[in-house]
A protein has these predicted regions:
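Extended, subdomain-level signal for the structured scaffold at the beginning of enzyme domains
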Residues: 1-111, 123-135
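Conserved small/polar residues in nucleotide/adenosyl-binding loops
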Residues: 137-139
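General beta-strand structural signal in soluble alpha/beta enzymes
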Residues: 35, 115-118
Length: 139
């Protein structure tokens, strides 16, 4: 199978593991991943978050590592991508209301291209009318 080009949507304080591990795994099997964040340019830094279970009833949240996005958000043409992935963490809590992010997700939905998400990333899909329907989402 030829490598695909995947668009990853992130926001400030997206979960570090859900960015780094996904990106590395996709590269390992021959895919290209362009990571974008609204209002950021290629090379700009976003802060990530780390969640850990430290013996409490729920996880703790800590500052993660800096991450350099590798594509300018304003330059994204969804027609250039085979799939979209929405990382989780805190990022989706605010990028889900960005009309440009919603338009990107809507494109993938309407063209039948794969949409992947993990954890809080599903908030982005829920924010786009018609993408998540009862009995049709596989989470």
């Amino acid at each position: 199978m030829a490598g695909k080009t995947i668009l990853m949507l992130v926001g400030e304080f997206s979960e570090e593991y859900e960015i780094f591990v996904f990106e590395q795994a996709m590269h390992a099997v021959g895919h290209t991943v362009h990571v974008v964040c609204p209002d950021k340019k290629a090379g700009d830094v976003i802060k990530t978050s780390l969640h850990d279970f430290e013996g409490n009833q729920t996880y703790t949240e800590k500052l993660g590592h800096d991450y350099h996005v590798n594509k300018t958000f304003a330059d994204v043409d969804p027609a250039d991508y085979d799939a979209v992935y929405c990382a989780g963490g805190r990022g989706p809590e605010y990028i889900r209301i960005d009309k440009r992010v919603q338009a990107l997700v809507r494109h993938f939905h309407e063209t039948g291209k794969p949409i992947f998400t993990i954890c809080h990333g599903v908030q982005i899909l829920i924010a786009v009318d018609g993408v998540v329907q009862i009995g049709r989402a596989h989470v």
